[in-house]
Design a protein with these regions (language model features):
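Conserved catalytic scaffold of divalent metal-dependent phosphoesterases
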Residues: 66, 84-169, 194-197, 218-219
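Conserved beta-sheet core of the metallophosphoesterase superfamily
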Residues: 156-222
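Core catalytic region of metal-dependent phosphoesterases/phosphodiesterases
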Residues: 4, 11, 15-116, 170-174
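Active-site environment of divalent metal-dependent phosphoester hydrolases
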Residues: 12-16, 53-56, 83-94, 128-131, ...
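Divalent metal-coordination and catalytic microenvironments
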Residues: 10, 30, 45, 50, ...
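Accessory, non-catalytic peripheral segments of nucleic-acid enzymes
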Residues: 216-300
């Protein structure tokens, strides 16, 4: 199926209400991913689900960014394999209506809509109904999918509960399982959650280990992860920390949620926001009063 593959997942085109900024981040990521794949000699690309964010509709500006990116991927690789995650599907219990099947008409893109096995590799789209029971019978050494496995972290704080269906131990025959779905990069045993393409919101705060993975199957090598250095970054900080560490803390394309642990006036708050956004090329600075912060903590 491949000698050396460049793999990514969970890019979520159309996130944040079809934000132009987010879709441009997605396109910038695709350009970086292709460049890294070429620099590392990858002839094959694989995407592990959740291309689009909105399950119900597609905005035309998002579609425009999607088609442009898909065409780039089709040209960049000998083959680019692509399967759906749950966000790409209209129905929860079947895959027949989705937002991505048009990609099979783009030269170079191979759209996988059923469990696919070739040599020692299996590609598995989002499982529906009782399909999870088939996992035990897949013999492939390398398995790529979009799985919801218990005990892994959905984000930095929340662990996935056990719903009594697919579990890590069902992957009996695999040596490596690579999955999309959970946005935090993590590994337990043979199961690797790749993590999303780049941080999307404050659930990803302080965790920039996002990007892509390279798998050199020809040389039986361990997976290698590459972080996207120019990714948007999310930080939650205290105002006192921000003032002391502004030179090292703030980076371009950063979203900052600042907890007001010091008394400041409205004018000072406006000055801080304007100065930091202009001087450091921040995207957003939200100032959170202490009382509001306590309410947020309670709701969690």
């Amino acid at each position: 199926l491949f000698k050396k593959a460049a793999v990514f997942t969970d890019i979520h085109f159309g996130l944040k209400g079809n934000s132009k900024v987010h879709n441009q981040d997605c396109e910038n990521f695709i350009d970086w991913y292709i460049e890294q794949a070429k620099d590392n000699g990858c002839e094959t690309g694989i995407f592990c689900g959740d291309w689009h964010h909105n399950r119900n509709s597609l905005n035309l500006t998002t579609m425009d960014a999607t088609i442009r990116s898909m065409e780039k991927l089709g040209k960049a690789f000998k083959k680019f394999y692509f399967f759906d995650g749950n966000h790409d599907l209209y129905y929860k219990d079947k895959r027949d209506v989705n937002s991505t099947a048009f990609a099979k008409h783009i030269p170079g893109i191979t759209f996988i809509d059923e469990v696919y096995e070739e040599e020692d590799v299996a590609l598995v789209p989002w499982l529906v109904g009782d399909e999870w029971k088939k996992i035990k019978s897949i013999k492939a050494k390398y398995l790529f999918g979009h799985f919801e496995l218990p005990s892994f972290y959905m984000n930095a704080m929340v662990q996935m509960p056990d719903h009594g269906e697919l579990k890590a131990e069902h992957f009996e025959h695999q040596e490596y399982v690579f999955s999309g779905h959970f946005h935090k990069r993590q590994k337990q045993g043979k199961i690797h959650y790749l993590g999303n393409a780049f941080p999307h919101n404050y659930a990803d705060a302080w965790d920039d280990d996002r990007g892509m993975m390279i798998l050199d199957r020809e040389n039986n090598a361990e997976p290698v992860y590459i972080n996207w250095p120019d990714c948007p970054k999310y930080r939650t900080v205290k105002l006192s920390q921000l003032i002391d560490e502004q030179a090292t803390l703030i980076k371009p394309n950063m979203y900052l949620r600042v907890n007001l642990d010091l008394p400041i006036s409205y004018e000072e708050a406006s000055f801080i926001k304007e100065t930091f956004i202009n001087n450091f090329n921040c995207r957003e600075i939200s100032l959170i009063p202490q009382k509001q912060l306590e309410e947020i903590s309670t709701q969690l």
